[in-house]
């Protein structure tokens, strides 16, 4: 699977990350959870005391960020950061910035191995030419229970 891109797409709470982690471990692929990048950016915005509605300050902040690291993302799975990530993800400039970051990260990893990326719209928007595209469909009640459990844990 060297130099191949696999995407795992689907709604929140569908199990995209779990599926992607399993495949990454099984096939020795680099795994990128795209949601971590939104959470990392949200954390940076919060640490800089920028109001989530102040798009001008957020856009100015983006100009000063060279790279967003996907490492140590579990620390970012708080309700405050998750809510902020959902809010900023609706902004086109932020989505474009994060999409570009994802492409850079994957390009750097493809030199060494294949990649699997999970996230919403990851196969239809960001990596349209992925070698394999997986779309996860899960009942809404199950998704809601999964999301609730994630927030509690």
Which residues does each PLM region occupy?
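ATP-dependent small-molecule kinase phosphotransfer cores
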Residues: 37-113, 121-126, 141-145, 149, ...
């Amino acid at each position: 699977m060297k130099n191949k891109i696999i995407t795992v797409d689907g709604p929140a709470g569908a199990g995209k990350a779990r599926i992607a982690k399993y495949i990454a471990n099984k096939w020795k692929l680099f795994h990128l959870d795209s949601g971590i990048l939104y959470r990392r950016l949200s954390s940076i915005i919060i640490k800089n005391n920028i109001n989530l509605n102040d798009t001008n300050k957020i856009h100015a902040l983006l100009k000063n960020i060279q790279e967003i690291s996907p490492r140590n993302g579990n620390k970012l799975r708080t309700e405050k950061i998750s809510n902020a990530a959902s809010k900023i993800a609706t902004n086109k400039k932020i989505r474009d910035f994060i999409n570009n970051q994802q492409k850079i990260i994957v390009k750097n990893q493809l030199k060494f191995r294949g990649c699997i990326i999970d996230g919403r719209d990851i196969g239809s928007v960001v990596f349209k030419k992925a070698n394999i595209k997986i779309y996860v469909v899960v009942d809404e009640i199950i998704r809601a229970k999964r999301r609730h459990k994630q927030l509690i844990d």
